[in-house]
Amino acid sequence: MSGELLNAALLSFGLIFVGWALGALLLKIQGAEE
């Protein structure tokens, strides 16, 4: 088992999760402003 492979998988998953969280937060903020 390669540590680099695990790091790459965690990094890509983390970026996807952060992007989803930011998108959901922006939608919630825009919905509250309207």
UniProtKB/Swiss-Prot annotation:
Pfam families per record: PetM (PF08041)
Annotated GO biological process: photosynthesis
GO molecular function, one term: electron transfer activity
Record keywords: Electron transport, Membrane, Photosynthesis, Thylakoid, Transmembrane, Transmembrane helix, Transport
GO CC annotation: cytochrome b6f complex; plasma membrane-derived thylakoid membrane
Disulphide bonds in the chain: none
Protein family membership: Belongs to the PetM family.
HAMAP family from the UniProt entry: Cytb6_f_PetM (MF_00396)
Function: Component of the cytochrome b6-f complex, which mediates electron transfer between photosystem II (PSII) and photosystem I (PSI), cyclic electron flow around PSI, and state transitions.
Subunit organization: The 4 large subunits of the cytochrome b6-f complex are cytochrome b6, subunit IV (17 kDa polypeptide, PetD), cytochrome f and the Rieske protein, while the 4 small subunits are PetG, PetL, PetM and PetN. The complex functions as a dimer.
Keyword Nucleotide-binding: no
TM stretches of this protein: 9-29
Topology of the protein relative to the lipid bilayer: Single-pass membrane protein
Cellular localisation: Cellular thylakoid membrane
Protein name: Cytochrome b6-f complex subunit 7
